[in-house]
Amino acid sequence: MLTKFETKSARVKGLSFHPKRPWILTSLHNGVIQLWDYRMCTLIDKFDEHDGPVRGIDFHKQQPLFVSGGDDYKIKVWNYKLRRCLFTLLGHLDYIRTTFFHHEYPWILSASDDQTIRVWNWQSRTCVCVLTGHNHYVMCAQFHPSEDLVVSASLDQTVRVWDISGLRKKNLSPGAVESDVRGITGVDLFGTTDAVVKHVLEGHDRGVNWAAFHPTMPLIVSGADDRQVKIWRMNESKAWEVDTCRGHYNNVSCAVFHPRQELILSNSEDKSIRVWDMSKRTGVQTFRRDHDRFWVLAAHPNLNLFAAGHDGGMIVFKLERERPAYAVHGNMLHYVKDRFLRQLDFNSSKDVAVMQLRSGSKFPVFSMSYNPAENAVLLCTRASNLENSTYDLYTIPKDADTQNPDAPEGKRSSGLTAVWVARNRFAVLDRMHSLLIKNLKNEITKKVQVPNCDEIFYAGTGNLLLRDAESITLFDVQQKRTLASVKISKVKYVIWSADMSHVALLAKHAIVICNRKLEALCNIHENIRVKSGAWDESGVFIYTTSNHIKYAVTTGDYGIIRTLDLPIYVTRVKGNNVYCLDRECRPRVLTIDPTEFKFKLALINRKYDEVLHMVRNAKLVGQSIIAYLQKKGYPEVALHFVKDEKTRFSLALECGNIEIALEAAKALDDKNCWEKLGEVALLQGNHQIVEMCYQRTKNFDKLSFLYLITGNLEKLRKMMKIAEIRKDMSGHYQNALYLGDVSERVRILKNCGQKSLAYLTAATHGLDEEAESLKETFDPEKETIPDIDPNAKLLQPPAPIMPLDTNWPLLTVSKGFFEGSIASKGKGGALAADIDIDTVGTEGWGEDAELQLDEDGFVEATEGLGDDALGKGQEEGGGWDVEEDLELPPELDIPPGAAGGAEDGFFVPPTKGTSPTQIWCNNSQLPVDHILAGSFETAMRLLHDQVGVTQFGPYKQLFLQTYARGRTTYQALPCLPSMYGYPNRNWKDAGLKNGVPAVGLKLNDLIQRLQLCYQLTTVGKFEEAVEKFRSILLSVPLLVVDNKQEIAEAQQLITICREYIVGLSMETERKKLPKETLEQQKRICEMAAYFTHSNLQPVHMILVLRTALNLFFKLKNFRTAAAFARRLLELGPKPEVAQQTRKILSACEKNPTDAYQLNYDMHNPFDICAASYRPIYRGKPVEKCPLSGACYSPEFKGQICKVTTVTEIGKDVIGLRISPLQFR
């Protein structure tokens, strides 16, 4: 059972699917009716007018109506569009159990506890017939889907079939209108001839709760309190019991026929739903709930959906998956339909059956994997119990008869999933979740240990994607190692792009798009289920949800392309066509409009010519496109779309387009717009527009200041006059101050009653007459004449030397692609004649309109033009002012003959060649060659890509020492700087362009340094030894070697350094640990034991084993100590050491037990985690350092390696490159 939707509510007593929309009505025990959208999983509406439980509910097949019946004895007819009850039908005298519309006539059928069944005309709103005969509650009554029959079930233990053909004839006869007018007078409580009992079905031992007709066959199913489901057959004369389905252990609430298969569904108060096979009369499936009794079942009239109501709500479910199994390769689609494997050619649309499949499985094919090389398919089938899942291996016949295809012999085996991993190998995930590799004979060739997973997917030749609960892992089957992983829970489908460069991981409600290395490029969350997907040729992922076709671009943009009525499964996308399969496995082609995602893709890829073409020709409209362009930083493109002036204004300001902003501001004429435009124009130095903005907003103070700084004194005087007219004393005085007009300032101060200030201003500035006249106005008794400052200095605004008439000069920047197109559209369009070239006639132009072309399609340059037209000799014409004599200074006179040509007068320097260091970089991909050339940046990049170096601090000294060896210096001439020589290691055949630098560091040097490290280890100077080992390890990537043997020796040198660094670092750490508690002592012993598994020299291994032996003997772990003693004796130590060891061994063998359990298993191979110093046993996930190969637990991935101190743990790299041989 596949649950599609589930609700939690009061007890559900009635259910009804809408025939066309994804809606379901639920009637609840608390009197509420709910309308749900089961595809979107949302509650659309609630209807609450009944008093008490509502048991009957039904949608009308054509009208926007539904009917309900409740325990308040009322039948209500509702209009869900108007969201209200239209009317109520009254007549029943007890609870109403079911209500159903007739499929054709305007009738409603109701069953009630008043022991009657009534037929109502919902158009005339009257009862047209009462069916009496049952002598207990009538629990259910339903119309026959095509005949004039009614079936009813009652607690009187009978099922009755009623013939209502008389009612139909009466209501469709000419006198039917009169009978409606008479009302219900022709009906009495004891029934009439309108409806007669045709059959009474007796066989149940207790009350019958439900009865229903088969959609097409003369069958009836019933469920009763005797816990049985009975099947009845009927004909014109009689009805009889066919069979009984036993299995429920409580009252059967409801039973229905499957609309399209030979199945019966029933549910019961025993908290189960059961599926029965009609032909075998046996139970096929059982679905149980823990606490909820089931009360009602409903089947969708058109889709394979069912709904069941229970104590805590309801569920919408399917019995089996409807997703078709298919595989696409090139232009071919292979898919399974009706037990046939079919092949569809996308190009020719030829659809043929190529093979008949082996029967035997009752479950549909779950998935398919196609092998084009061998023309073979793997078909996986999932059982409800996963352990019973199987797969079939078929080879498709080459010359199959498409009319009557054969059923070739297939090879069937158990397994959850099978996918191809090579031309003649496939991988099987078995029921134990281990991976088997099989050949075409279905024989196991090898078993592969993989991390814990529950599903596998194809990931290219030799690779698989492994799914666990939280992530997807890319696994190399050949090398048996994990390459990458990405976090996404419960991936259902994996879709690779055609070139395998991108992959889409589809979960139930999420999509993650990754690159080949499984690095997540974008995450998309959907509220509705994701169904399928395919990659477009342009690299856009087209996917479907339950009700949409959508697109996703790898940058994270996604959107809706079109809506869907029913779910589809995309198989291929090409151009405007989406090829898909529907749930009936029918191939379909849907047309989509790709403009929106192609527009966004063109923007992302900076294909601006395509963008502009779409802007001008495509119908891209809507606020979302404008918002998208603004968000992505393309306001100038958004300007193309916008007609609304307010939006145009804000976009124009955003992209700094003052001209368009000015047009929009004039159209809007809003104060805020003018203010904003003024601010932006001021930033651009466009003072002419700033002036207009200040004038429009009447911002006189700013306008005056603008005139002052631009030196426009004429307009500043006008501003002074305006201020005087406006009686703005402050503004008037300020403008006078800007102009340096002293007499005007005196007049202003005098007019506003500031006599003292007016006098001081006049006297200080030498306006004596004015000062005297003001002095006379002072009253000596009441007013004092202010004193004049003898040291006063004249403050006068500087006179403008060059008034600024033009706008501030702006740098000439190249206009953006779109700004240029806007400008050309505006200016060029105004100058160009608005003529359609196709409408120009040829008569008036005559033959001159036709160009005479030569064979190559070029115009003969001189044809049709005489000498007069071209000018004889083709010298410069008089239109060019090139012949005017210029007066040049005499010192520029050039002696005759000096201008005789480049070879006589001027030295042309030779072109600069490529430097030797650049040649080195060009010729080599070895890091050391780039360091010797001084190109540290490229050397770092090579080290990063080859061995994963991310911290270059420790390399600084090595880089500088190596660079110093890359050149020689010599003195050429006295008093001149030294010159450099660049020695080549391939000097015999280097030539000018093939040189590579001589290298100072040799492999033998490092091997000699290794001996010193061994000596330091022997004398116990561990920390110093670790530093020396690390120095050798970091030097290895800077080697250059000539043959494969030396490459192997260098790699062996890395292994030696790693083993010693990990072991000695662990030993140093062990010695620092405290020894107070038992747990601390156990940890010390564990670390000593791990050290014995390092690959060291025998002399050092003896010392390590002696240490471990002593520690374990003291801890009384005699069994492990004995093992160490035996290993020590095998190495042949000194006689005194051997004697001591044998004594300890004999003591241990007397009591060969371990006193304490340690995290150490000597028999299980393991690697030591170089960070935590704990074992990583074989088969556990492990991350490695790309340079040293040191092992780490997965939690350390992405951190810096403790061994090298420079590399990133778990980084995916090319590998160590120290020889030109490795690049061939």
Swiss-Prot record:
Complex formation: Oligomeric complex that consists of at least the alpha, beta, beta', gamma, delta, epsilon and zeta subunits. Interacts with SCYL1. Interacts with JAGN1. Interacts with TMEM41B. Interacts with SVEP1. Probably interacts with PEX11A.
Query: Which organism is this entry from?
Result: Bos taurus (Bovine)
What gene name is listed for this protein? Answer: COPA
This protein's membrane topology, according to the annotation, is: Peripheral membrane protein
| Keyword terms of this UniProt record | Cytoplasm, Cytoplasmic vesicle, ER-Golgi transport, Golgi apparatus, Hormone, Membrane, Methylation, Phosphoprotein, Protein transport, Repeat, Secreted, Transport, WD repeat
Superkingdom of origin organism: Eukaryota
Q: What is this protein called?
A: Coatomer subunit alpha
Alphabetical GO CC annotations of the entry are:
COPI vesicle coat; extracellular region; Golgi membrane
Q: Where in the cell is it found?
A: Cytoplasm; Golgi apparatus membrane; Cytoplasmic vesicle, COPI-coated vesicle membrane
Query: What job does the chain carry out?
Result: The coatomer is a cytosolic protein complex that binds to dilysine motifs and reversibly associates with Golgi non-clathrin-coated vesicles, which further mediate biosynthetic protein transport from the ER, via the Golgi up to the trans Golgi network. Coatomer complex is required for budding from Golgi membranes, and is essential for the retrograde Golgi-to-ER transport of dilysine-tagged proteins.
Q: InterPro entries under this entry?
A: Beta-prop_COPA/B_2nd, Coatomer_alpha_WD-assoc_reg, Coatomer_asu, Coatomer_asu_C, Coatomer_complex_subunit, G-protein_beta_WD-40_rep, TPR_COPA_B, WD40/YVTN_repeat-like_dom_sf
Chief location of this protein within or outside the cell = cytoplasm
What terms describe the molecular function in GO for this protein?
A: hormone activity; structural molecule activity
| Any one GO biological process | endoplasmic reticulum to Golgi vesicle-mediated transport
Residues with the modification Omega-N-methylarginine, per the entry, are R965
Matching SMART domains: WD40
Q: Where are the WD repeats?
A: 7-37, 49-79, 91-121, 133-163, 203-233, 247-277
Q: Locate the Phosphoserine modifications and list their residues.
A: S173, S1193
